[in-house]
């Protein structure tokens, strides 16, 4: 689950980290009032969406009057912001963050992720702040500094100081950086985060360090023990199909192809997408129906897949372990009839009673193509999607 910038900064403030004074507002009038509360003569107004690249898309602006802040809020509230990280429809803006202006002398980067290879939290820092860190890592990896956190003792101040020296910080900045480093590490662990970024972490004109942005992603598997963070969830930022799928315990991710995929098991689902690509097709989604491929779940899965107007054919790839393939076939037939599927459906069944399942499909009289293997299924569905 992602958090908005204003929510991330709220957590930063709770851990004593330096952030700008600001208010999240949802009306133009509140934007003007926020300027009065903050004081000063310059403010930064930011559209709140779960996507980067807001500045280049016009979603971040420096304003010098309350009227300009009000106008910015009126421009974006209730509208969709399109950035390089969103699809063509963009993300809806329901909050505007109004905060004090910061004099920036230099921009740095500081972030943390869970490194699966070392099974540790790893911090990354760089002098290349304010830009796409993935681009920096690809083009100049030597500019990415790393510190691995020992789970037994946690982040240590000396690690923060070491990074600070490598970043060229000096004097009071070293201690400030170490405090931010340790605070972020505690926040990361306490809230079961999967990713945390401060981009940029800036050196102000007076030499102090300041967290100018906050990007936080929480591990979805740990949400059951983070009741406070559950209240931070903004459903308007979720893909409607993904949110609907979650209600039925279906793992769905929308993609940009035209071949719908329905599979039981995440690994098999990824393998299915790979082989579709191998044969020249483009998956329209990742969809894992899980271990219980019942008629009800298959029906909902079909509804979700076919809600994408780009889908020209559907590939169903099911491995029958405990569940018999003939029962799965009956479920698929029932779902196709109930939903009224108009596009070709290619089904590959393997496992318990697979032959009987294929026979049931063949005798259904529906537009269902029974494949003999995964390769055959991929070839058949690609042809079907092309209208051949």
From Swiss-Prot:
Reaction equations catalysed: succinate + ATP + CoA = succinyl-CoA + ADP + phosphate; GTP + succinate + CoA = succinyl-CoA + GDP + phosphate
Coiled-coil intervals in this record? none
Q: What is this protein called?
A: Succinate--CoA ligase [ADP-forming] subunit beta
Ligase found in the keyword field: yes
**ATP-grasp domain: from which residue to which, for each copy?**
9-244
Q: Name the protein family.
A: Belongs to the succinate/malate CoA ligase beta subunit family.
Q: Which source organism does the UniProt entry give?
A: Pseudomonas putida (strain W619)
Cofactor(s) for this UniProt protein: Mg(2+)
Q: Which GO terms describe its cellular component?
A: cytosol; succinate-CoA ligase complex
Q: Enumerate the residues binding Mg(2+).
A: 199, 213
One MF term in the entry's GO annotations? magnesium ion binding
Q: Which PROSITE patterns match?
A: ATP_GRASP, SUCCINYL_COA_LIG_3
Record PANTHER family: SUCCINATE--COA LIGASE [GDP-FORMING] SUBUNIT BETA, MITOCHONDRIAL (PTHR11815:SF10), SUCCINYL-COA SYNTHETASE BETA CHAIN (PTHR11815)
Q: In which pathway does it act?
A: Carbohydrate metabolism; tricarboxylic acid cycle; succinate from succinyl-CoA (ligase route): step 1/1
According to its UniProt entry, the protein's GO biological process terms are: succinyl-CoA metabolic process; tricarboxylic acid cycle
| Function in brief | Succinyl-CoA synthetase functions in the citric acid cycle (TCA), coupling the hydrolysis of succinyl-CoA to the synthesis of either ATP or GTP and thus represents the only step of substrate-level phosphorylation in the TCA. The beta subunit provides nucleotide specificity of the enzyme and binds the substrate succinate, while the binding sites for coenzyme A and phosphate are found in the alpha subunit.
Residues bound to substrate are 264, 321-323
Q: Which Pfam families match?
A: ATP-grasp_2, Ligase_CoA
Q: Which UniProt keywords apply?
A: ATP-binding, Ligase, Magnesium, Metal-binding, Nucleotide-binding, Tricarboxylic acid cycle
Q: How is the cofactor bound?
A: Binds 1 Mg(2+) ion per subunit.
Quick one: which residues bind ATP? 46, 53-55, 99, 102, 107
Q: How does it assemble?
A: Heterotetramer of two alpha and two beta subunits.
Q: What is its EC number?
A: 6.2.1.5
């Amino acid at each position: 689950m992602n958090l908005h910038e204003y929510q991330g900064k709220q957590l930063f403030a709770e851990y004593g980290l330096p952030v700008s004074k600001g208010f999240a507002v949802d009306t133009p009038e509140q934007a003007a009032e926020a300027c009065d509360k903050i004081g000063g003569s310059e403010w930064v107004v930011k559209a709140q969406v779960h996507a980067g690249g807001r500045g280049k898309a016009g979603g971040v602006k420096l304003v010098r009057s309350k009227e300009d802040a009000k106008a910015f809020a009126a421009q974006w509230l209730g509208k969709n912001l399109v950035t390089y990280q969103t699809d063509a429809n963009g993300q809806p803006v329901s909050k505007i963050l109004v905060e004090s202006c910061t004099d920036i002398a230099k921009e740095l980067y500081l972030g943390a992720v869970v490194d699966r290879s070392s099974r540790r939290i790893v911090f990354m820092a760089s002098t290349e702040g304010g830009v796409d860190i993935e681009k920096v890592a690809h083009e100049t990896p030597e500019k990415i500094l790393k510190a691995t956190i020992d789970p037994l003792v946690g982040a240590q101040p000396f690690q923060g100081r070491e990074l600070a020296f490598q970043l060229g910080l000096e004097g009071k900045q070293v201690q400030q950086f170490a405090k931010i480093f340790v605070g972020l590490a505690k926040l990361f662990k306490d809230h079961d985060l999967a990713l945390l970024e401060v981009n940029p972490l800036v050196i102000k004109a007076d030499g102090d360090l300041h967290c100018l942005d906050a990007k936080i992603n929480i591990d979805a598997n740990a949400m059951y023990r983070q009741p406070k963070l559950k209240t931070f969830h903004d459903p308007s930022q979720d893909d409607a199909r993904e949110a609907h799928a979650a209600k039925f315990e279906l793992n769905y991710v929308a993609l940009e192809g035209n071949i719908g995929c329905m599979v039981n098991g995440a690994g098999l689902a990824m393998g299915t997408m790979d082989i579709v690509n191998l044969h020249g097709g483009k998956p329209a989604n990742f969809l894992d129906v899980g271990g219980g491929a019942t008629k009800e779940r298959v029906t909902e899965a079909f509804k979700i897949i076919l809600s994408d107007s780009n889908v020209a054919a559907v590939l169903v790839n099911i491995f029958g372990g405990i569940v018999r393939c003939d029962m799965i076939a009956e479920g698929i037939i029932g779902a196709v009839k109930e939903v009224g599927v108009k596009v070709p459906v290619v089904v590959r069944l393997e496992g318990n009673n697979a032959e009987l399942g294929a026979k049931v499909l063949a005798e259904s009289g529906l537009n269902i193509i029974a494949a003999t293997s995964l390769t055959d299924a991929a070839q058949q569905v690609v042809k079907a999607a092309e209208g051949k």
